[in-house]
C-alpha cells in the first residue's frame, strides 16, 4: 500500500467552515442521504430528497441489488453530488449482497457461512477482529472502480454501519484511497476528526447526527428544533430516506425511520426553518475540492 503525504495547507483552522471559505460563525450543514442502491424505494426517495427537498448529497452502496438502477439515475443527474458508502456488512436477510471481489480473495471479510457479517455488535467485532487490511483494500478498490467504470465521478468515501471504518488502519487506508482518487472522506468520530483538522482538512466540527438515533414519534419537530439549535461551524446529518411503501415494509424493519426521514426532508417546514435560521446547506463537492487540493500521493 502506497504511503500518502497529507500536507497542512496552512495553520489548521479552529473551524472547518473557515477552510471552506466561510466565516467562523457561519452555520454550515451537509444533509447526506445514506444507503442509495439498497433497494428501489430508497433510490426514489433519495433522488427526490436531493432534487426537491433539503438533502444536499448522497452515498451509494455499490454491492447492493439496486445499485445499477441508482447509478443509472445518477448518470442522468450529474449535478447530484454522491459518495461511495463503502460496504463490508449486510443487515437485510431478504436483500442479498456480498463483496464485489471474488470471495476466495477476501475470505477474512466473510463469516463462517461465506457471507458478509451483520452489523450487530457481535458481527462487527468478529469482522474487525479478523479482517486483513489487504483484503479490505481489495474490496474498497473494487467498489470505487465499479463506480468509475460506470462513468460516474463520486465526491467522497464513507462507511456503511462502521463508524470511521471501525479500525484506525481502515480509516488510514480510506484516507489513502481518497488521496489517490481525489475524494474527501466523511470522518465521524472525534479522534479521527482531530487528526484531519491537524492536516488542514475539513471535517464536521460538531456532533454527527445519524437519523437512526432519533425517536420516530415527533421526529419532524425534533428535526426542526435541531436546525434552530444548530451550532456554528460545519455540521453533518446522515439521513436515510425511503418511500416507506409496501416493498420497504416487506424487506426493511427500519422502514419507519426511513419514511419519516423522507417526509421531513421533502417538507415545506424543513426549507422554511433553514431559511429562517440562515443555515447554509453545502454538499460534499465543496468539501472534496479542499481535500483533493490538500492531499498528494507520495
What does each model-identified segment do?
Residues 1-30:
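N-terminal pre-catalytic segment of deacetylase/amide-hydrolase enzymes
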Residues 185-186, 251-298:
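C-terminal domain-boundary segment and adjacent tail
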Residues 130-202, 213-217, 228:
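Catalytic domains of cell-wall/extracellular-matrix polysaccharide-remodeling enzymes
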Residues 34-36, 63, 85-91, 160-162, ...:
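Active-site beta-loop-alpha junctions enriched in small/polar residues
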Residues 21, 46-52, 68-81, 99-104, ...:
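Acidic (Asp/Glu)-rich catalytic clusters
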Amino acid at each position: 500500500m502506497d504511503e500518502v503525504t497529507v500536507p497542512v495547507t496552512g495553520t489548521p483552522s479552529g473551524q472547518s467552515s473557515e477552510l471552506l471559505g466561510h466565516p467562523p460563525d457561519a452555520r454550515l450543514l451537509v444533509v447526506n442521504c445514506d444507503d442509495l442502491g439498497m433497494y428501489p424505494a430508497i433510490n426514489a426517495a433519495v433522488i427526490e430528497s436531493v432534487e426537491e427537498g433539503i438533502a444536499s448529497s448522497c452515498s451509494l452502496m455499490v454491492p447492493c441489488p439496486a445499485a445499477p438502477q441508482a447509478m443509472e439515475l445518477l448518470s442522468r443527474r450529474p449535478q447530484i453530488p454522491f459518495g461511495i458508502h463503502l460496504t463490508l456488512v449486510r443487515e437485510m436477510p431478504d436483500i442479498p449482497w456480498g463483496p464485489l471481489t471474488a470471495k476466495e480473495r477476501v475470505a477474512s471479510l466473510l463469516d463462517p457461512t461465506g457471507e458478509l457479517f451483520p452489523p450487530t455488535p457481535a458481527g462487527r467485532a468478529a469482522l474487525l477482529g479478523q479482517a486483513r487490511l489487504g483484503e479490505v483494500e481489495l474490496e474498497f478498490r473494487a467498489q470505487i472502480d465499479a463506480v468509475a467504470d460506470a462513468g460516474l465521478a463520486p465526491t467522497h468515501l464513507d462507511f456503511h454501519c462502521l463508524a470511521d471504518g471501525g479500525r484506525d488502519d481502515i480509516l488510514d487506508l480510506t484516507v489513502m484511497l481518497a488521496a489517490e482518487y481525489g475524494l474527501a472522506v466523511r470522518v465521524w468520530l472525534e479522534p479521527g476528526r482531530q487528526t484531519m483538522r491537524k492536516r488542514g482538512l475539513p471535517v464536521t466540527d460538531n456532533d454527527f447526527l445519524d437519523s437512526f438515533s432519533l425517536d420516530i414519534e415527533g421526529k419532524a419537530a425534533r428535526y426542526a428544533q435541531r436546525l434552530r439549535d444548530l451550532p456554528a461551524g460545519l455540521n453533518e446529518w446522515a439521513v436515510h430516506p425511503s418511500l416507506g411503501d409496501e416493498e420497504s415494509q416487506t424487506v426493511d424493519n427500519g422502514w419507519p425511520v426511513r419514511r419519516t426521514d423522507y417526509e421531513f426532508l421533502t417538507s415545506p417546514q424543513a426549507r422554511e426553518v433553514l431559511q429562517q435560521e440562515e443555515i447554509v446547506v453545502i454538499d460534499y463537492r465543496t468539501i472534496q475540492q479542499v481535500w483533493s487540493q490538500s492531499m498528494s500521493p507520495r
